[in-house]
């Protein structure tokens, strides 16, 4: 039987009454966001809006982005990536479970020194996926060129975020490349492996 989104009690500031809200709304009040599904335009728009709001509300406090995602749309993921870089708030990225493909890219995009993973997390990087249907040869050629352009852009960004060379990133992402949390730290995708919430925001 499917499990619905849990609700938890929440008392608005200044109110003596509690109301029930979904758990993600409650976590958002604490500046905790969760990417727990495939990256698509809907989830990207939601996360972008939440980050912009939290940043405008108080950019002196960090935003915590928990990631357990198989990846997904490159364009949707880049919208989240650009917003992480755009906001003034530090963005603490935390891998729980799996950060694969665009999920790994967003994990590495967090504020340097504040990219972390739990001990049994898995991280996977690879080149962007692309496919063609029955279309004109000229359209297929255009799409192929765009995929290669995006691949180079992602690899350059990943090299910058990890400290690895462009050539190593290009070689490692030619196929699915899985890393443990400790291996991801050594690779430069994250800064620390943590076991307690208090460790997440340490530089």
UniProtKB/Swiss-Prot annotation:
The keyword NADP does not apply. It comes from the Bacteria. It is found in: Cytoplasm. The gene is clpP2. Keywords: Cytoplasm, Hydrolase, Protease, Serine protease. Signal peptide: none annotated. InterPro entries: ClpP, ClpP/crotonase-like_dom_sf, ClpP/TepA, ClpP_His_AS, ClpP_Ser_AS. The active site is at residues 101, 126. Pfam families: CLP_protease (PF00574). GO terms for biological process: protein quality control for misfolded or incompletely synthesized proteins. Fourteen ClpP subunits assemble into 2 heptameric rings which stack back to back to give a disk-like structure with a central cavity, resembling the structure of eukaryotic proteasomes. One of its GO terms (cellular component) is endopeptidase Clp complex. Its EC number is 3.4.21.92. Cleaves peptides in various proteins in a process that requires ATP hydrolysis. Has a chymotrypsin-like activity. Plays a major role in the degradation of misfolded proteins. Its main location: cytoplasm. HAMAP family: ClpP (MF_00444). It catalyses: Hydrolysis of proteins to small peptides in the presence of ATP and magnesium. alpha-casein is the usual test substrate. In the absence of ATP, only oligopeptides shorter than five residues are hydrolyzed (such as succinyl-Leu-Tyr-|-NHMec, and Leu-Tyr-Leu-|-Tyr-Trp, in which cleavage of the -Tyr-|-Leu- and -Tyr-|-Trp bonds also occurs). This is ATP-dependent Clp protease proteolytic subunit 2. One of its GO terms (molecular function) is serine-type endopeptidase activity. Belongs to the peptidase S14 family.
